[in-house]
Amino acid sequence: MDILTLIFYSIYLMIPAYLANGSALVFGGGTPMDFGHYCWDNRRLIGNGVTWRGTVCGGLFGMVIGGILGLLATYGIGSYFFNITASQITFMSGFVPQGLLVGFLLGFGALIGDAIGSFLKRRLNFERGKPVPLLDQLDFVVVSLLFVSTVVSLSLEMIVIIILVSIFLHLGANMFAYMINLKDVWY
């Protein structure tokens, strides 16, 4: 596979994770995942930024996006997503069910990763909204890749490309969210 195809495939694979992570901001609000509980260090377990509504809605949104990508692959559009993964997911037949599964794993993996990142930021005494370079950009990526690797084989090259691309996409998406007043900070 040439490098441009690998970059395209890597980005295409991660679309459910990227969109789930962004949609949690849009659909979020309500009850925090930690229910307001504090940890042994007298700081919030996760904080108000990670909510049940954002996590559930964002994760389901990732699953729907995966299903849509599967539907597109059924008609030959975006088949890169499934040229490699279809042979890996042998217990499900059809692009749409496989897409739903991959989207579910990527979407919820991204949001669990974001919650883990918030937990780590609280333990390191960073306030909500304060930047922690690389952790902010990669928490959701690493966990979503761990989740999806249970059904999809990922090459080292793909993982490196996904990490590099994700850093820049995350920064760009945050700047855009700041410009349209969805975020209070540009990072």
Swiss-Prot record:
Its EC number is 2.7.7.67. It is a multi-pass membrane protein. GO terms for molecular function: CDP-2,3-bis-(O-geranylgeranyl)-sn-glycerol synthase activity. GO terms for biological process: glycerophospholipid biosynthetic process. It catalyses: 2,3-bis-O-(geranylgeranyl)-sn-glycerol 1-phosphate + CTP + H(+) = CDP-2,3-bis-O-(geranylgeranyl)-sn-glycerol + diphosphate. Keywords: Cell membrane, Lipid biosynthesis, Lipid metabolism, Magnesium, Membrane, Phospholipid biosynthesis, Phospholipid metabolism, Transferase, Transmembrane, Transmembrane helix. Its cofactor is Mg(2+). It is found in: Cell membrane. Its main location: membrane. Pathway: Membrane lipid metabolism; glycerophospholipid metabolism. One of its GO terms (cellular component) is plasma membrane. Disulfide bonds: none annotated. The chain crosses the membrane at residues 7-27, 58-78, 100-120, 137-156, 167-187. It is an enzyme of class 2 (transferase). Coiled coil: none annotated. Belongs to the CDP-archaeol synthase family. Catalyzes the formation of CDP-2,3-bis-(O-geranylgeranyl)-sn-glycerol (CDP-archaeol) from 2,3-bis-(O-geranylgeranyl)-sn-glycerol 1-phosphate (DGGGP) and CTP. This reaction is the third ether-bond-formation step in the biosynthesis of archaeal membrane lipids. This is CDP-archaeol synthase.
